């Protein structure tokens, strides 16, 4: 296991938080363009200062805790999602020699951290002592547990081809070709599961405003609500980075750009895809989402593993 220098570690973690905050502006601006309207354009050039204005507004809002809530759990819950998402970035290989930690079970570490994030939503729904919050947290738990299975199975094809759980070795194994082509079914399954894991539209059923008034964060306001918000965008960035690492060669690309630039550009493409889904697709019913997972995603990912193993055994 190799650990980066303290300056690199601090720089990476701070950069991820700044990027997550900036993505709020990107999403609002892009959705405005796609919906033929301006989006935020009042604070700073092109509205770039809107994020700072929103942060100031949230900071000065009343930090209210419902009197019927379980106060210690209510306070801790928002921090869990931010901490787990930030810790997930420590195994992401951004470029050769650029990363926090390089160890052999980086992919398993990512799955472990992503599964812990749902505790934030479950505890928030429980501690709020609100029926809508509790229903949202139960939806979040069932959705995350189900789609974690499919995400893990989708990644197994890549592990079989690379022969390693080390994310840096998986990237280096793609020097002769990205895994998105031989693992296209696995890529599609991983992408769908990532959207469901992030609880992003159209799979934002745990917080569906039209159904359960905001779900698990119904009772939250101020900085605590902001932590949930930033945690969501950290999850989008983390899952986009893992998608790029597993299926699109990570930092690998033509020499006219440095490796870190290739990694950032590829990750940005998937972040914009996450945003586009919100603007383009309607939300399915909850039973349809769960049925799709177990009746379509599970057979697809299992078939992908079987085919990958069969091809690997037949080709010397």
Curated annotation (Swiss-Prot):
Predominant localisation class: membrane
GO cellular component, one term: plasma membrane
Keyword Coiled coil: no
Entries under PANTHER family matching the protein: NADH DEHYDROGENASE SUBUNIT 1, NADH-UBIQUINONE OXIDOREDUCTASE CHAIN 1
Enzyme class: translocase
Reaction catalyzed: a quinone + NADH + 5 H(+)(in) = a quinol + NAD(+) + 4 H(+)(out)
Protein family per UniProt: Belongs to the complex I subunit 1 family.
EC number: 7.1.1.-
Gene Ontology biological process terms in this record: aerobic respiration
Source organism (scientific name): Methylococcus capsulatus (strain ATCC 33009 / NCIMB 11132 / Bath)
Keyword terms: Cell inner membrane, Cell membrane, Membrane, NAD, Quinone, Translocase, Transmembrane, Transmembrane helix, Ubiquinone
Transmembrane segments: 6-26, 74-94, 98-118, 145-165, 177-197, 233-253, 256-276, 296-316
Membrane topology: Multi-pass membrane protein
Quaternary state and interactors: NDH-1 is composed of 14 different subunits. Subunits NuoA, H, J, K, L, M, N constitute the membrane sector of the complex.
NCBIfam families assigned to the protein according to its UniProt record, in alphabetical order: PRK06076.1-1, PRK06076.1-2
InterPro entries attached to this UniProt entry: NADH_UbQ_OxRdtase_su1/FPO, NADH_UbQ_OxRdtase_su1_CS
Compartmental location: Cell inner membrane
Record's function text: NDH-1 shuttles electrons from NADH, via FMN and iron-sulfur (Fe-S) centers, to quinones in the respiratory chain. The immediate electron acceptor for the enzyme in this species is believed to be ubiquinone. Couples the redox reaction to proton translocation (for every two electrons transferred, four hydrogen ions are translocated across the cytoplasmic membrane), and thus conserves the redox energy in a proton gradient. This subunit may bind ubiquinone.
Keyword check for Translocase: yes
Name assigned to this protein: NADH-quinone oxidoreductase subunit H
Single GO MF descriptor: NADH dehydrogenase activity
């Amino acid at each position: 296991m190799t650990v980066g220098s303290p300056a690199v570690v601090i720089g990476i973690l701070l950069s991820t938080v700044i990027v997550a905050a900036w993505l709020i502006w990107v999403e609002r601006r892009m959705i405005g363009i796609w919906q033929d309207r301006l989006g935020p354009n009042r604070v700073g050039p092109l509205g770039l200062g809107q994020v700072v204005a929103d942060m100031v507004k949230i900071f000065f809002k009343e930090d209210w805790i419902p009197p019927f809530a379980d106060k210690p759990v209510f306070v801790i819950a928002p921090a869990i999602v931010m901490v787990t998402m930030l810790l997930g970035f420590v195994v992401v290989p951004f470029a050769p020699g650029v990363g926090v930690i390089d160890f052999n079970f980086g992919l398993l570490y990512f799955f472990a951290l992503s599964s812990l994030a749902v505790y934030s939503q479950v505890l928030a729904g429980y501690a709020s002592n609100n029926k809508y919050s509790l229903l949202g947290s139960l939806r979040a738990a069932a959705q995350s547990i189900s789609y974690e299975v499919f995400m893990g199975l989708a990644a197994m094809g890549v592990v079989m081809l690379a022969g390693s759980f080390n994310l840096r070795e998986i990237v280096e194994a793609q020097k002769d070709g990205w895994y998105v082509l031989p693992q296209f079914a696995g890529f599609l399954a991983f992408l769908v599961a990532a959207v469901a894991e992030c609880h992003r539209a159209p799979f934002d059923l745990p917080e569906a405003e039209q159904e359960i008034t905001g779900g698990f964060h119904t009772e939250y306001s101020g900085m605590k609500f902001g932590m949930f918000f930033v945690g969501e965008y950290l999850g989008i960035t983390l899952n986009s980075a893992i998608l790029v690492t597993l299926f699109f060669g990570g930092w690998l690309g033509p020499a006219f750009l440095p490796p870190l630039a290739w990694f950032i550009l590829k990750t940005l493409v998937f972040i914009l895809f996450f945003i586009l889904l919100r603007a383009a697709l309607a939300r399915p019913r909850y039973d349809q989402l769960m049925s799709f997972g177990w009746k379509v995603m599970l057979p697809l990912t299992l078939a992908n593993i079987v085919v990958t193993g069969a091809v690997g055994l037949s080709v010397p």
